[in-house]
């Protein structure tokens, strides 16, 4: 007999518990086990007034944002609607069935105010990272570093002209304040400057049109693929390499974690960065060297010249010396250029009578060999590249790329919603926090978590 859902009389009272309706294998249940925000109120207390009406609970807002970043809900308007309707989201946010969900404008007001001043998102990221460290998911044996370009919320067709008025938006004010600060990193001026987000960098994408973008820089522990630090920069290679120093030193300062080796691509193989790794931090560089000295026209390359470190000179294939100076100065000179290199030159007389001149310096009267002041660190990287361990670590570089792919394809962070470098930093911190929470749910959960509506 066909059944019916009609009942003679509806019950007057219901016994309802949110915990009973959320499945035990739900992703948010696993994440909730590893998310401890008990210290958040104490961290934010100096940024709240002691008088006036009570504000929205900051832990509630953080939990709602984490739902959005963990499950790819990019719009805060939609996030508020989803939390209002979804019982699992209410359970994760500690809301009862009758509690009111905050308005979407609450997030904007707090983000541009006390959350940014207190670095609340950095605090939450480090709380989750500390939980990963205590759970043994971060070993510190090796870190992999890489950067990925993410489109900014800026139109490609609109850029600043010299006679334009900048206006007064938050991203504009942040940019103008940054111009007044001293910048220790030399970066070429951008070709175009966005009118709405001037800190975004005009970037040429391979195989596609250029666009305004920021770079998210990840420092990842190669053990379990945990993001140990993240830094937002304009999309420029020099700034990306500089951010790696910031992340390594910050991790060392706050968690006393010193890595033994750093894995990266050719962008991190500059002489200065290798010198910092080897000489200052005693980090083993698993990085391809940025070589410029090898020639392909049949003439002698720099590797064909032997360097005597004690005597400080090169010896050419014809057994002649290349030295820094051919005469003495009253005041000793270092010979170090602005590019942190030293030029070694041969004698004109030796080169004029040399039978190998056509293979060495056919178009110049003498041969010049340039040596970096960090050449000893480059030699260390060359020796590391010959080891079997280096071949293994090359495969581990993919861990960072997989996280970037997960960020853009699954978590939907392929275009930023917030403007300015601070807005990019907020989004990248929340994304990395969500990825670490999902990692813990995967490795430390009691069973495979079920992610609703996602691949």
How should these model regions be labeled?
Residues 13, 22, 35, 39, ...:
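Generic alpha-helix structural propensity
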Residues 24-66, 71, 373:
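Basic, short loop/linker segments at the boundary and entry of helix-turn-helix/winged-helix-like folds
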Residues 12, 16, 38, 42, ...:
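A generic, residue-level signal for flexible/boundary positions that often mark functional hotspots
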Residues 1-29:
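Hydrophobic alpha-helical membrane-insertion signals
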Residues 4-5, 72-85, 95-455:
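Anion-binding and metal-coordination hotspots
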């Amino acid at each position: 007999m066909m059944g019916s859902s009609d009942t003679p009389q509806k019950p007057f009272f219901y016994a309802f518990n949110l915990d009973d309706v959320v499945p035990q294998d739900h992703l948010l249940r696993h994440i909730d086990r590893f998310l401890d925000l008990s210290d958040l109120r104490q961290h934010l207390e100096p940024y709240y007034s002691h008088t006036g009406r009570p504000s929205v609970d900051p832990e509630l807002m953080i939990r709602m944002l984490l739902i959005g970043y963990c499950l790819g809900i990019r719009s805060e308007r939609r996030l508020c609607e989803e939390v209002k309707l979804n019982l699992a989201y209410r359970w994760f946010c500690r809301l009862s069935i009758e509690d009111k969900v905050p308005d979407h404008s609450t997030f904007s007001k707090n983000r541009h105010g006390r959350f940014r001043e207190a670095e609340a998102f950095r605090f939450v990221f480090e709380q989750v990272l500390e939980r990963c460290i205590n759970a043994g998911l971060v070993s510190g044996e090796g870190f992999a570093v890489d950067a990925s370009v993410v489109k900014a919320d800026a139109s490609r067709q609109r850029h600043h002209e010299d006679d334009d008025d900048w206006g007064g938006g938050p991203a504009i004010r942040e940019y103008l304040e940054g111009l007044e600060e001293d910048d220790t990193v030399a970066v070429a001026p951008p070709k175009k400057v966005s009118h709405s987000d001037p800190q975004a960098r005009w970037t040429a994408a391979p195989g596609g049109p250029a666009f305004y973008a920021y770079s998210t820089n990840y420092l990842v522990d190669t053990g379990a693929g945990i993001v140990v630090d993240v830094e937002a920069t304009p999309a420029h290679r020099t700034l990306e390499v500089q951010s790696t120093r910031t992340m390594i030193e910050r991790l060392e300062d706050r968690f006393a974690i010193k890595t033994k080796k750093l894995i990266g691509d050719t962008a991190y193989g500059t002489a200065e960065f290798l010198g910092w790794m080897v000489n200052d931090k005693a980090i083993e560089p698993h990085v391809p060297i940025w070589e410029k000295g090898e020639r392909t026209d049949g003439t002698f390359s720099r590797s064909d010249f032997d360097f005597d470190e004690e005597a400080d000179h090169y010896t050419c294939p014809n057994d002649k010396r290349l030295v820094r100076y051919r005469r003495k100065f009253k005041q000793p000179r270092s010979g170090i250029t602005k590019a942190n290199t030293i030029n070694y030159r041969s004698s004109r007389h030796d080169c004029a009578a040399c039978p190998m001149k056509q293979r060495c310096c056919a178009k110049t009267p003498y041969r010049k060999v340039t040596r970096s002041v960090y050449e000893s660190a480059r030699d260390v990287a060359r020796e590391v590249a010959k080891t079997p361990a280096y071949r293994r670590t090359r495969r581990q570089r993919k861990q960072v790329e997989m996280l970037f792919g997960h960020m853009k394809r699954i978590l939907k962070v392929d275009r930023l919603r917030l403007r300015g470098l601070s807005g990019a930093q907020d989004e990248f911190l929340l994304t990395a926090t969500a990825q670490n929470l999902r990692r813990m749910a995967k490795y430390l959960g009691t069973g495979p978590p079920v992610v609703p509506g996602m691949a």
